[in-house]
Amino acid sequence: MPLAEGSTFAGFTIVRQLGSGGMGEVYLARHPRLPRQDALKVLRADVSADGEYRARFNREADAAASLWHPHIVAVHDRGEFDGQLWIDMDFVDGTDTVSLLRDRYPNGMPGPEVTEIITAVAEALDYAHERRLLHRDVKPANILIANPDSPDRRIMLADFGIAGWVDDPSGLTATNMTVGTVSYAAPEQLMGNELDGRADQYALAATAFHLLTGSPPFQHANPAVVISQHLSASPPAIGDRVPELTPLDPVFAKALAKQPKDRYQRCVDFARALGHRLGGAGDPDDTRVSQPVAVAAPAKRSLLRTAVIVPAVLAMLLVMAVAVTVREFQRADDERAAQPARTRTTTSAGTTTSVAPASTTRPAPTTPTTTGAADTATASPTAAVVAIGALCFPLGSTGTTKTGATAYCSTLQGTNTTIWSLTEDTVASPTVTATADPTEAPLPIEQESPIRVCMQQTGQTRRECREEIRRSNGWP
């Protein structure tokens, strides 16, 4: 249960909640002794209860607290109170790049602004790498901008020390990666292999791609498909998304290479090449060999956990991806065979509308053309048909339900899970009840909640919602 405003936790006075996710909540809180307000992150009790997790949390929080850099959100303190781990960080009064994309630049940010952001974050990452600390969760949501409309704005990277543990024994991080971080994670991180700074460089490049185009490099409603694309698909050419960015194609081809050895050795090398191609300073052919900093390997037991847990999760997701891919090819064949029948024409009040088959790719914008009495409008839909309650990303994208209603990729309250919803804001926890199916084993809450969201928003039965979500997610 979230902490109430005015309540006290570990000596901090809660001012208000700033956000929440699958691992806990973040609050604006008054420091117990100093005249300042901090960001207090409180982890859930079930997360905090894991002994190995707690030890790693304390170890990495201590390491993060040693970082002192103008572009890193500082960690001041950490502890445990009433069975919950907490960490005290700088409060950044401003926004994040996800909000900037949503509110100001839905089709991508200006090149000079992206260069400034990526350069600042690259410097922060290389500073941490030199001190043998990885971030492992670089993404737009973790890039904060203080005083965004002021000349003295600050760009800061958040969540060092508490984000992206790929060997999380509780499975929470792996679950989170399937719906969010997976859009930016390097192949070796998804496979649970040993990491160095080039994994963060990959994530930084994927983030830059998103900032420049308005969407991450690989997109699909099913996270399993995105994982398979990170592992095997060629890096997308950014010029195919935004033609004027074609000069950046070789930069992203290198930065998003599957093998770490083929990428830029340091994050600032990538930022320099990006800035040069966008018209800033830097050397596009900077091939100086800078040895990546190898982060100290964890104990053998942790490596074994990584080798077992992450590939196990990945194997399950890849099975899903194969099923989805086969289904997509079959559907594509069916559509090609029946293309004339799939284009339907309806006439109403002298207006003819041709509707092409739905596509998961982002088509070029279409402008209706009017021709007097026989007005004709031809439009290609910009969103795929989706199932309410099914997994989705990126956050803020839109789709169309089978009834023609607009669906929004929104966050399910109290989790990091993003699902299709008929409401644009955070999806409230469902209140509808459902009769248990005696033929089905009880589902975990993370699977049951989206089903009930579907029931509540669409009026369908539990079985109907479950089957639609199962098909959409590619589950067997």
UniProtKB/Swiss-Prot annotation:
Task: List the top taxonomic levels of the source.
Answer: Bacteria, Bacillati, Actinomycetota, Actinomycetes, Mycobacteriales
Protein name (Swiss-Prot/TrEMBL): Serine/threonine-protein kinase PknF
Residues with the Phosphothreonine modification: 8, 13, 173, 175, 287
Its EC top class is: transferase
Q: Which organism is it from?
A: Mycobacterium bovis (strain ATCC BAA-935 / AF2122/97)
- List residues of the Protein kinase domain: 12-279
What family, per the record?
Belongs to the protein kinase superfamily. Ser/Thr protein kinase family.
Spell out the InterPro entries in the cross-references.
Kinase-like_dom_sf, Prot_kinase_dom, Ser/Thr_kinase_AS
Q: Which domain of life is it from?
A: Bacteria
Start and end residues of each stretch annotated as Disordered: 332-376
One MF term from GO for this chain?
ATP binding
Which catalysed reactions does the entry list for this protein? Answer: L-seryl-[protein] + ATP = O-phospho-L-seryl-[protein] + ADP + H(+); L-threonyl-[protein] + ATP = O-phospho-L-threonyl-[protein] + ADP + H(+)
- List UniProt keywords, sorted A-Z: ATP-binding, Kinase, Nucleotide-binding, Phosphoprotein, Serine/threonine-protein kinase, Transferase
Positions that bind ATP:
18-26, 41
